[in-house]
Swiss-Prot record:
GO terms for biological process: cellular response to reactive oxygen species; defense response to bacterium; positive regulation of reactive oxygen species metabolic process; replicative senescence. It is found in: Mitochondrion inner membrane. It is a single-pass membrane protein. The keyword Metal-binding does not apply. It comes from Xenopus tropicalis. One of its GO terms (cellular component) is mitochondrial inner membrane. SMART domains: Romo1 (SM01378). The lineage of its organism: Eukaryota, Metazoa, Chordata, Craniata, Vertebrata. This is Reactive oxygen species modulator 1. Belongs to the MGR2 family. Residues 42-60 are annotated as: Sufficient for antibacterial activity.
Length: 79
């Protein structure tokens, strides 16, 4: 598929670049949401210290990966 050229001679990002950008944006949003929800749920369970950091970090990575994957799929569909 030929690459479209913008009005000033700039080429548009490739489909892979769009999927990659979708994943990165989704991962960032998922990490932020995971930090909020993970902190709340870990504090509710009474975690403190190293256990709290581990629980929040795990929740951040899980929600970041999940939301990033869905955003990447959505951007791939739009290509």
């Amino acid at each position: 598929m030929p690459v479209a050229v913008g009005p000033y001679g700039q080429s548009q990002p490739s489909c892979f670049d769009r999927v990659k950008m979708g994943f990165m944006m989704g991962f960032a949003v998922g990490m932020a949401a995971g930090a909020l929800f993970g902190t709340f749920s870990c504090l509710r369970f009474g975690m403190r210290g190293r256990e709290l950091m581990g629980g929040v970090g795990k929740t951040m990575m899980q929600s970041g990966g999940t939301f990033g994957t869905f955003m990447a799929i959505g951007m791939g569909i739009r290509c």
